Amino acid sequence: MLREIRKVAVLGAGTMGARIAVHLANASIPALLLDIVPREVPPEEQAKGLTLDHLQVRNRLAMAGLEAALKSRPAAFFVPEAARMITVGNFEDNLAWIKDCDWIIEAVTEDRNIKRVLLEKAQALLAPGAIVSTNTSGISIASIAEGFREEFRRHWLGTHFFNPPRYMKLLEVIPTADTLPEVVEAVSRFGDEALGKGIVLAKDTPNFIANRIGTFVTLDVLGMAGPDGQQGGYTIEEIDALTGPAMGLPKSATFRTLDIVGIDVLVHVVKNLEASLPHDERRDLFRIPDFITRMIERKLLGEKTGQGFYKKVKGGDEGEILTLDLQTFEYRARQKPKLPALEMAKNVEDARQRVTALLQSPERAGEFYRKVLGDAFHYAANRIPEISDDIVSIDNAMKWGFNWESGVFELWDAVGVEKIAEQWKKEKRPIPPLAEKLLTSSKKAFYQQSDGLTRYFDLRSGDYRALEQGPGVILLPSLKARKREIKKNPGASLIDLGDGVACLEFHSKMNSIGADTVQMAHAGLKALNEGFDAMVIGNQAANFCVGANLMLLLVAIQEGEWDDVHQAVRAFQSANMALKYAPKPVVAAPFGLTLGGGVEICLHSARVRAAAETYMGLVEVGVGLIPAAGGTKEMLVRAMDAAPRDEGADPFALVKEVFQNIGMARVSTSAEEARRLGYLSARDSISMNRDRLIADAKQLALDLVKLGFRPGKPRDDIQVLGQSAFAKMKLGLHLMRRAEFISDYDVVVGTHLAKVLSGGGEFTSPQRVSEQYLLDLEREAFVSLCGQRKTVERIQHMLKKGKPLRN
C-alpha cells in the first residue's frame, strides 16, 4: 500500500539536491537533506578544535548546500524562515532517518555506480510503500535499479526536476517497466498539486524529452555560429537576437543561457547523448563544436568562471559586457545585429505570427529560421513514439523546461505543416511518419480547437484525441469559447464559472486598470445582486495586473482635465469599496506581477487566493504618486487593527512599516513574502500551481458561501495618530535625504504619503476617522502630485523605459 507523501528525504546536497529540498520546504513539506561525510577537516575547522567526529564537520556538505540555497539569487526560498522545514544530516550517521519518509529523492553526482551503492544501502531502510526516485538527467532509470529487490523496483522511477526547481515548471516523471501505475499517479499528483509542477510522462530514453529536443536545437544553432558555421556564419549577437523573444524564447536566448547553465554542463549532456544514441538519424549533430572544446580548454565556462560567451568588465555605472569573438577568441565590444527583418517583426506581438513572418523573409533571419525550425520540426516528429507517445508531452516539455512560448508542434501548426512538408519533398528529405500520417488523413494541423476543447493528433490512432484537463483546472478561454462570457468590453469580461460563481477577467494591455475595468467590476457586483453567489477576480495572462493605465492618466494631465482625473480616482475608489462590502464573497486570484491598482483590488476583496509566485507591491511612488484607490487607506487599516491594545502601547511602529513598504515601493518575491509585507492577510491562502488558481479561488468563494458569508459595514473607527506620527515620518524622510538614499522629490512624494497615513497631519492627538475620510485624503494627495512636473517626468519615463526615474 502506498504511503501518503508527508515527509521527503533528498539524498545529495549539491545544487539540485539542495534546491529540491528547498522547494519541498516552500510547499510546507518537511524534508531531510543528506550528503556524504567530508574526508578531511580544513584548516579553519581545525583552528576551532573540530575533528571528523564533530557534527558540524560531518554535516558540513549538507549544511553548505542549504546555506548556498539561502544566499542564492533569485531566491530559492519563498521566505528564509522556510529553512526550518529542512533537517540536514549525512549518509553515515543519518541514512536510517529515511525510514520515516514517504518519498526518497536521490540527487547525488551523475555516476551510475555511486547512485547504485547509495540506493543499495537505502533499500534496506525503507518503510513499506515508500517511493524512491532519481533526479538523474540522463542515466537510464531502469539500469540504476537493475538487480534490486522487486518491491524496490515497483516503487522506483525517475523524477527529473529542472533548475532552479522553484522557478522551472517542468517535472519529467519517468517510470520503468516495473513501476506500479499507482506510484506514477501518486508522484504526478503530488508534483502537480503540492509542488506546482507541470507533469510530463517521459520514456526511459537518453536525456528523456526536454533535454533531448532542447540539446538538439542548441547544437543545431551552435552549428550556425562563427566563421565556420552553416548558412553564412552568424555572430553570437545575431544568434541571441534570433533565438530570444523574437522566436518566443527567453531573453537569455542561446549563448546567455549557456553561460548561466555552464559550458561544461552542455559538454556533459552532449557526450552522454553521443554515447547513448548510436542509431539516432542525427547522431552527427551530437558532437562538441570545436569552439566549445577551445572554451573548455581555456576555462571559459560561463558565469561560474566569470567569462564564457560573454564577459562583464568594470567600467561606467553598471560595467560593460563584452562578447567572445569566435574567430580570434578575444573579447570585443558587443555589436548590434543588422537584421532588418527582425526589426520589422518586433511589431508583431504574437510569437507564432512573428515566426511565420520571419520564415518567409529572404534575408539572413529567414535563412536561419528555415534551417533551425525545419530541423527542429523534423527531429521532434521522428522522436514519436521513441521518447513520448504524444506531441503534447514534447510541446509541454519545451514550454515548461526551456520556457518556450509555444511548443515545437504548436509552432509547426502556425507555420503550416503542409507547407514545411512540401519544402522537404523538394529537398528530397524524408517526411517523418507522424507528419506523413497526419497529411494522408486529410488533416492540416497537429492541434484542433472546437467547442472550447483542444484536440491533438495521435499517431497510433491516426485521429484527433481530446486533450483532457485534469480536475481542478479551469481554462477561461475554453469557457468563453463555450459561450460562457456574460459581458465584455475592451478591457475586461464577466464569465460564468459555473456553480453560481462569476469571474471578472482583465484583458487590457498588460492588464492595466482603466475605466473599462472599473465598469466591468460594477457589472460583476450587479451580477451578484441578480443571481450569482460569489465572484472571482482573475485572469490567465502573463501577469495579474501591472496597475493603473498610466497612458490615460498622462493624457488627462497634459490636457489639464483635472475633473477627469478626480473622477477616475473616485470611480476606482468607489469600485473597490463596493467590492469590499459586496453582499456576497469576492475572491481575488493574483499571480505574477500584481502591482499598484492590482494590489488595491486584492486588498478590498473578501479573500485572496494567490499563486505562490505572486510579486505584489504598491509601487506608485516610482511614478511620483501614492496609492489612491484605497491602497494607502487599507494598509493603514490593517496596521491599526493589528496594533497592540495594551495601555500605553505605541502603534507607530506598524504605521512606520506601512510607510516604508509603500514609500520604498517594496515588491514581494513570493506570495508568502507578500503576507509578511501586509499585502496578504492571515486569512488569505496560496496555490502552488498557477494552473489551478482559478479553480482554487472558485472553491474558496463557494466555501465562504457555505459558511454563511456576511459583509461588513464601512468603517468609521480607524485610529490615526496625527501630528506626532506625521513629524516622525517627515524626520525619517529628512534623514534619508541627508544620507542621499532618496531625492528631493522623493521627499515631496513621501510627505504626501505621510500626511495620509497620519490622518491629514493636523490632529494634535490620535483620532478616529472613517474610511471615506482617508479616501478623500488619498485622492487629494494623488491629484496634487499629478500637477507636479517631476511626477509627469516619472510617468513619461516609466511609459518609455519601463523602469522608474529617480529625479
Question: Residue ranges of each PLM-predicted region?
Answer:
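N-terminal glycine-rich phosphate-binding loop for ADP-containing cofactors
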Residues: 1-535, 539-542, 551-571, 575-584, ...
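Extended, composition-driven regions rather than compact fold-specific motifs
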Residues: 546-548
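Short alpha-helical segment that forms part of, or immediately flanks, the ligand-binding pocket
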Residues: 600
